[in-house]
Amino acid sequence: MDSFFINGYVPRDTFIHRLHPTTKLLIFLLFVILVFVPIGFVFQSVIFVFATVIFFVAKLPGRFYLSSIKSISLLFLLLLFVNWFTFRDPGFYITADQVNTVKPHFNGNNFNFWNISLFNYQDNVFSQVFNFNRANMTELNKINFFFKETANANAYTKVTGIDKLAEMLASKNLFKFNGSTNGIDKNKILGAFLDHKIAVYLGRSWGGDFSGFVIDVSVSDKTSTFTIKPFLANSNYVLTLRAIILAFYVTQKILIMIILATVLTSTSSSVELAYGIERLLWPLKLLRVPVNVFAMTIAIAIRFVPSLLLESQRILNAQASRGLDFKNGNFFVKMRSLSSLVVPMISIAFRNAGELASAMEARGYDPTKKRTTYRKFKIDWVDATALILTALYFVVIIFLTVKGAVFLDLGTPEWLLTGKIKEQVERSLSVKSA
């Protein structure tokens, strides 16, 4: 049964095996935290590459890695199916050079716009570090598979809230017609919107057609907000690149967890795991918590899982040789067949637990007494270096994530996952009335 779950301790002479057990546990926990934090596609991919490199540096069998990938392939398909029908919005990105937010003004005959920069990402602390500039943004579609440039869709533009905008501008006497104050003609405002050049990059999709734009005009006493949004004519079967990436994004999280857990359990013996957990939970001793009991329980549980799964495979083979069919039949037939597996497994689990308890008792194990260790674990410069580098990486990634750094110039689909670009566009489209 070549599954990652049955990977026991694999003795090898590598620096990963020689790391202090507490160091390995701390590094594992830091990366687990990073996996659960929404750090984005790029940073998560870096962790995935790191986990893969560590796996092979530890000289673990390649079949463990392949079985890990096979085990979550079904999960990826399930997530893809769910995202297919729940994420039909491909996301969008409006370029700075081609689109401007506007303040309406009247030049005597026509209603025009003052040009105001739509998309200014220089507010980001890391704009210079990652070279966020307009020139690169306008060329984004040429270097990035994730975008496609739409045709001009001004003929399909919808404008909502235009009546309230006209009423507000007229009531404040903001504009003059031929030297005199008059009411604002909403048709001129509408015409100015429709004449305004709008271009947008959409995430790629299959089965949906781009229909145009919606300009939503929100009016208050002090501000008038113009929000430009694309809208699509999508069918129930539209598949967006965003759905594929989101499915892969979540699946990658689980795969990273599997690889890291495999490295931890395959490079640490039961004694090392118990020692590392006990040292890691040492502060709880101040609260009179039996840390050594918890540590031994966790270590034994980790080691019991592989043995139980091996036993389950043996039972399946034995029952199949007796003519029991676990593969054919409807759902209820298969459930009844599984009873012949569950009952022996429970019996074996209790038997193994009893044998282990007797063996520990015969060796004089007493959880209430202080225990010594045969092997002395010491933290050397390798452990310190590995822990410091991991901690620095952890701090940098969290800091960049909090600041909202993304990698548009690298052609990544970061904006599909975080939505930060979309939020920034909508914020930039909010302008005060003249």
Curated annotation (Swiss-Prot):
Q: What is its main location?
A: membrane
TM ranges are 27-47, 64-84, 244-264, 289-309, 387-407
Signal peptide location in the record?
none
Q: Which InterPro entries does this UniProt record tie to the protein?
A: ABC/ECF_trnsptr_transmembrane
Q: Which domain of life is it from?
A: Bacteria
Keyword terms of this UniProt record: Cell membrane, Membrane, Transmembrane, Transmembrane helix
Membrane topology per the entry is:
Multi-pass membrane protein
Q: Name one GO cellular component term.
A: plasma membrane
Family that this chain belongs to:
Belongs to the CbiQ family.
Name used for this protein in its record: Uncharacterized protein MG181 homolog
